[in-house]
Amino acid sequence: MRKTVKRESEATGGKREADDEPEKLRSVKKEKQRKTEADSVRPDEPPPPQEEEQGISDRRILRSKYLSLQNEINDCKDDLMKIDSDKFSRIINAVENLHQQVRKPREQIADAEALLDIANTLMSSVKSQSAHGVSPAEFVNALISGFGQGSLGIDTDETAQVSLKWKDLGFAVCSTVLVSCGCSTMLGPMDTELKQRKRAPNRKRTKPGEGVRPDEVDDSQSEEKTDTDKNMTIMFNILGKKKRVQLENLVLNRRSFAQTVENLFALSFLAKDGRVEIIVDKSGSHFAMPRNAPDANVVMSGEVIYNHFVFRLDFKDWKLMSEMVPLGEELMPHRQTAVASSSCPAASAPASADFTQDTQTTPIRKLSRNRGLVVQEETVVEDTPDKEGDGTRRRCKRRLTSS
């Protein structure tokens, strides 16, 4: 009996497995159909909504938090370097949390100022520790030796309390705080009288003249490009050839700090127009790459928004940048500034030679206050024809009279 029951159970189990197999196949097919339908529907769905921009009130609250954090840094600057204090780690964590909320350049500046305050505070504390000054223990020992009550011998207990002569200490310090601050304002006269306003004279009104229509000026000629536009064109052509360059190599001009700033302005305008993309790699280096500028219709519709970047650069940073960038790897060329007074030196040389040949020197008497009657030679230029025969040159004839 047991064998027959087992065989029947095995037979029924095999039938159940055979019945379950087509059901599993059907469920797998349905899941595949659902996935294909979902993939076909995804392109038609609208893109996920982007993060809404921060409001004015949120940005104001963020800047106020940065301001309170800077005040806290200035207040507890003495406790940042203590071993048993956790203020440094707490402030750094607070700055990092606020940095995650920064979206605009104004808040980026506040974030950079907070980090700069922390760095300056740590540097000043390190300098104060390295300097050889009076420690608090030495100051207290000097007070006890000068104004302490009781004998300070070798046999005295270290745990014994020492009292000070506060009256003598006050008299000693009194000379430095004798000056009291009073009222430094000045009161005006008490008998002020009301001044009568002078009556302004009436001006005669002139009748308007006849209307005149100005001549229209032909604006067909294209406007000349400014220096900034030329720098932008040169920089974009360099980026088009190199495709990916470091920011320092693109901006730096080793010979001129002013031209480095001009290159930085040109890069900022290219980034604003969407023609340059600035990225940061894992090591923290900045790279610039060219991009195609968006169409005007896309900008007007609001799909594309102009962005700016903040770059702090002073003379010390320029010196450091010139040391970091290897010599000869600067990409922007040096621009020569033209000076009007030094132009055409070769053309002015023969003219000056002709002028010296045609001039005559005549003694002229002048009366000087310090030396009396003085004889001074002056040049008198007369009208002479041109030697080359191209025409006559007009030269002024100067007459000098003596009093």
From Swiss-Prot:
Ranges of biased composition (kind: Basic and acidic residues): 1-45, 384-393
Annotated InterPro entries: Nse4/EID (IPR027786), Nse4_C (IPR014854)
Entry keywords, A to Z: DNA damage, DNA recombination, DNA repair, Nucleus
Cellular localisation: Nucleus
Positions with biased composition (Low complexity): 342-353
Basic residues biased stretches: 196-206, 394-403
Compositional bias ranges of the Polar residues kind: 354-363
Matches recorded under Pfam families: Nse4_C (PF08743)
A cellular component term, taken from the record's GO annotations: euchromatin
Tissue distribution: Expressed in seedlings, rosette leaves and floral buds.
Record GO biological process: DNA recombination; DNA repair
Superkingdom per UniProt: Eukaryota
Region Disordered, residue ranges: 1-57, 194-226, 342-403
Protein task: Component of the SMC5-SMC6 complex, that promotes sister chromatid alignment after DNA damage and facilitates double-stranded DNA breaks (DSBs) repair via homologous recombination between sister chromatids.
Complex and partners: Interacts with SMC5, SMC6A or SMC6B. The SMC5-SMC6 complex is composed of the SMC5 and SMC6 heterodimer attached via their hinge domain and from the non-SMC subunit NSE4A or NSE4B.
Family under the similarity heading: Belongs to the NSE4 family.
Identification of the protein by name: Non-structural maintenance of chromosomes element 4 homolog A
Protein encoded by which gene: NSE4A
